[in-house]
Amino acid sequence: MTSRPPLFSLTLLSACALGYEILLIHLFAIIRHHHFASMVISLALIGYGLSGTCLSIWRLPLSRLYPAVYISCIIFFGCSVLGSFLLVQQIPFNGDEVIWDKYQLVYLCGQFLLLLLPFFFAATAIGLTLYVYPLRITTIYGFDLVGAGAGSLLLI
């Protein structure tokens, strides 16, 4: 691809993704028990891993449609950040009942699937950008790291 990579939007996306992760950790520490807050990190990693798996399978068709897929992932990220958190609040999960109520594990899995969606969309946009612009990987990765650092610092 001869055009330039979308470095500014990629930086903002990375900042928002890591900021959202930190926000979820704080919210889970308040709303749920503190040990559920540490599970947010694994949620983000699962979302990124799932994205990498999908990109390894469908990278060629997705790279041909890069601008549309990139913009769609950013839009879906924004919608899923708010939507997934609101939907998770409707799931009747109670961590105290996990031991004797088998449905609580189903509710927990449902919450996990909903909450990993924003991380999946962010990682898909970032990963596809890295694939489409192979000669600019160091620059793209640098802007991604700057965005992640900025997103962390702004929330702390």
Regions found by a protein language model. Give the residues of each.
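Alpha-helical transmembrane segments of multi-pass membrane proteins
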Residues: 1-156
